[in-house]
């Protein structure tokens, strides 16, 4: 499709494999000894190693701008129908499954502005004041399209179930529940 041969592709390495060394002139300029350079890993895989997600069947949920469910596996597990991704982990002989929601904590900033609140802590406080007797409001956090489980860059965010009984507090709660 792109007229590139395998010879034109870079070498592949395990994340922990040494691929070179810091250039001597850079090491000298920085006052360092020779430093090995390793292949490394993607942001989620490196973060997973940092919190100890290194063995098969371990999993974590990471909420930042996006939301990531990360599960360690011993091999490649393809789930294309669900848009669950399978990647090499940053560690040798490990893989991981990853589901990504493109808008997670970023929705909290957006909702705080939408409801006229000053910041995310104020949004959380408002959510805690939501009327428990009110009918539920549902929020789909597709403010940047979506990747998992529906790989659709055109997906849009939605509030539904709104009535006259709902206000900023109920919207705040819906956003927190929709992201979580």
Predicted regions and their residues:
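Active-site core segments that coordinate phosphate-bearing ligands/cofactors
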Residues: 1-3, 17-180
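Conserved phosphate-donor
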Residues: 12
